[in-house]
């Protein structure tokens, strides 16, 4: 057998939310992200938004029950997000925790050190009930 060819993969995480505009503002504040595109008031931003860090895609937000995408219909029919963690590494953990406090986010686990990767984490809930983890870089807590 020959060596497997390595593919270039870029994660493009998308979550369904009830209010794209509100969720976009929440995540922009939490992550220090910005919206993709020149017109932040474009009408389609009520249905879909892309959050960026520099030129890198961080998270896509899509309204429930719009544009008839499978699995993005019927928000109330089934639980969503169970077993999914939206995990973000942040350069300045203390500043990220301050943003969490300013947002008034529900904290699931207060800041703590994860002993395996030796980094700090805070686990919170976003406005749609998704679990969000903010973590410092691995080894930062040594």
Q: What name fits each language-model region?
A:
Residues 56-69, 79, 83-85, 132-141:
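Membrane-topology and secretion signals of cell-surface/extracellular proteins
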Residues 2-4, 27, 74-78:
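A short alpha-helix capping/helix-coil boundary motif
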Residues 43-45, 69, 117, 141:
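Generic structural signal for helix capping and beta-alpha/helix-loop junctions
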Residues 1-6, 10-19, 47-53, 72-142:
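Vicinal oxygen chelate
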Residues 5-7, 14-59, 64:
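Core segments of cupin and vicinal oxygen chelate
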Residues 41-42, 92, 114-115:
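Short beta->alpha connector loops
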Residues 66, 90, 112:
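Active-site loop/turn elements of alpha/beta-hydrolase fold enzymes
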